[in-house]
Amino acid sequence: MNLLNEFRKQNRQELVLSVNNKILNCTKCDNEFCHKCYRGSINAKVLIINDNATNDEDIIKYYNDLIDMSELNNNDILQVFAVSCVTTRKDKDSVIQRLPSKKECGNCKQYLNEIIDAVKPKIIISLGATALNQFIPGSNLLEYINTKQVFNGIPTLINYSVKDLFNLCSYKTDDEIDEISSSILATFNEAAQYLRLEGDNS
């Protein structure tokens, strides 16, 4: 049995690394900046699909802080992006980040499917509209917040992304922002509870 488990682990690692290499060498889009497709454990039981990749350090730090505050075990998490590129546009003399186009989303969908097939997580956490629309095209994120859906046959929890949270700061009250932060944290904890109920945290 141990030999079989080692074989499965090695095969999973090879598959995930293969997808990662495809993303790093992808030329489907003209985007200059790309991130690795994953961060975390290849033996993950929880796959977290974030919005498109970002290089905003404040967003990255706040997201990591929420993960650290949650009941999730870092050894159980694999984190990927719905779109692996940092999508940008020029605004006068500066370059700012933008939402990915439908074409860019479509180009990355194959990589998401391959990661899910390779890792076979017990549960998925989908954060943000971009992640949701990769699996339920044309959907309105607000209608799916705090719901459970099924992506590629796997139970999936839906919520805002941390990037959404930062964008909402300009027209939401502090109390509303705190409520959304708590909601995202609750989603992480719900995934941890799901694993406990499934007996997969041993």
PLM segments and residue spans:
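A polyanion-binding, active-site-adjacent surface
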Residues: 2-202
